[in-house]
Amino acid sequence: MEHKRESNLELLRILMILSIIGHHFVVNSGLPQLFSFDNITFNMVFLQVFGMWGKTAINVFTLITGYFMVKSDLTLKKFLKLYLPIKFWSFLFTFIFAITGYTIFSFKDIWKIIFSMIYEADVYYAGTLIVMMLLIPFMNVLARALSKRQYQLMLAVLLIYFTFLSTFMMRDTFDFTGWLCTVYLIGGYIRLYPLKVDNLKC
């Protein structure tokens, strides 16, 4: 069965990819360390704005994943389609950096790549994403079983815990894995209970 391509989501994906590239360019270039807030320049402001959307892009990608995956099942093929490219590029760049002298080769780095779920989960996106993917079958069962009201209450509790308490109560409640699962469930809610705009008038 063919799936209808949604051009608006494709465009959004492209914009988010560019946002992630911009974020890594600014953050990993070392330029932020040269910024002086005593002498704010146009270049400084431009780079700050240009590189500020990396986390937003991660949230958007997770939201889209929840939107499309909540009604489907995570198969081994789908999981490996995500997992294997991550490992391939991780190994490739590790060897390239070692060969070019950018980094020193270490078997510890290889070990960390193999067991990234242990070393990177809740720290780096790739490791956390793999953990979230493994939780998708369970989140889907939960999302489909809850009533609309129960689903809303669950999201309210999660959002209060991860955002309100840390923002207004100064509590360190944020957790990267938990947050990605929350955003996934928000995407699933949007898919299961879409906003009907047919009768809305401007």
Where are these regions (language model features)?
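Membrane-cytosol interface segments of multi-pass membrane proteins
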Residues: M1-I160, N199-L200
